């Protein structure tokens, strides 16, 4: 399908990708950072194999972006990998920083790593850190860059994976230069940079998203509704509708399956929810995203009463619902 698009495709080391980008923004509709210690352990094992020359390179996956100009990119696909590599580099930099007697080379390496993580030319503190995760992850992510704050283990994947990498660097005692030059720089990606208004990010996302942590039907539907909107509209509709839909329904995919069954009077299998929803949205609402979200929120409120995420305003009805 590539010939039908205006995309720019290139294979390159992920370190080069990070170096040349000034700003990488994860849109609000993207799910939270989901990589666990197991995923990071596998990545670290791959890097160690590269260091020991058992492999000459390792393909990390595809990263899809929309270039908004001036080195600013919206991350459409690949945010899990990008976030993990950023955490890896930051942990490596802090491992060197915390050494009692760092060598001159190690001090210089810290500055090198900083160039992959920080946009030194940015005059705004908000845009100084190159990668900007979605709002759910942002607080924990920014804390890692705060030299004054102690990083302790908690329920954040971002923090815990940072601590995992840092501990591995201490245990293995491989030189930071070797980790970077013989390991990280051999991690390759395929970068797909889309042209806004010309390429269809949703179609490309669906075609490529087959690796990493599986997306639920709820994730895919959220992306489908919000992805092709302008960033400001994405954030507005996400806050106004989607956050409420998630809060009211607990399991968005299951809610939408029941919503579709009710609206179409047809049985919908769990594996078919996403494709069924897309057809329904086009046939019923001519793909008008505002109307779709309004209707979803209306039924999410009713659904929430049934599953008791929201009490019904009539106490007798609420009491009856709780006994179903």
Task: Name the predicted role of every residue range.
Residues 105-144:
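Extended charged low-complexity segments that act as oligomerization/scaffolding linkers
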């Amino acid at each position: 399908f590539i010939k039908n698009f205006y995309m720019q495709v290139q294979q390159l080391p992920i370190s080069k990708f990070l170096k040349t980008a000034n700003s990488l923004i994860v849109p609000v509709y993207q799910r939270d950072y989901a990589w666990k210690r197991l995923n990071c352990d596998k990545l670290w094992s791959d890097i160690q194999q590269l260091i020991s020359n058992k492999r000459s390179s390792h393909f990390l996956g595809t990263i899809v972006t929309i270039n908004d100009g001036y080195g600013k990119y919206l991350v459409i696909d690949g945010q899990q990998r990008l976030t993990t590599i950023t955490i890896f580099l930051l942990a490596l930099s802090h491992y060197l920083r915390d050494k009692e007697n760092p060598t001159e080379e190690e001090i210089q390496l810290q500055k090198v790593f900083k160039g992959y993580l920080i946009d030194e030319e940015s005059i705004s503190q908000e845009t100084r850190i190159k990668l900007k995760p979605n709002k759910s992850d942002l607080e924990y992510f920014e804390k890692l860059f705060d030299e004054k704050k102690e990083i302790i283990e908690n329920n954040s994947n971002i923090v815990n994976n940072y601590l995992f990498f840092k501990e591995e660097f201490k245990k293995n005692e491989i030189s930071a230069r070797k980790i970077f030059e013989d390991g990280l720089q051999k991690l390759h990606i395929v970068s797909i940079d889309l042209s806004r208004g010309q390429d269809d990010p949703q179609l490309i996302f669906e075609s490529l998203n087959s690796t990493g942590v599986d997306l639920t039907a709820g994730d895919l539907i959220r992306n489908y509704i919000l992805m092709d909107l302008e960033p400001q509209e994405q954030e507005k509709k996400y806050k106004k509708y989607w956050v409420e839909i998630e809060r009211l329904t607990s399991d968005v995919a299951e809610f939408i399956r029941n919503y579709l069954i009710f609206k179409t009077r047809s049985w919908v299998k769990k594996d078919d929810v996403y494709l069924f929803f897309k057809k329904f949205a086009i046939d019923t609402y001519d793909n008008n995203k505002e109307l779709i979200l309004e209707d979803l929120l209306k039924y999410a409120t009713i659904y929430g009463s049934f599953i008791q995420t929201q009490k019904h305003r009539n106490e007798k009805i609420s009491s009856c619902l709780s006994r179903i």
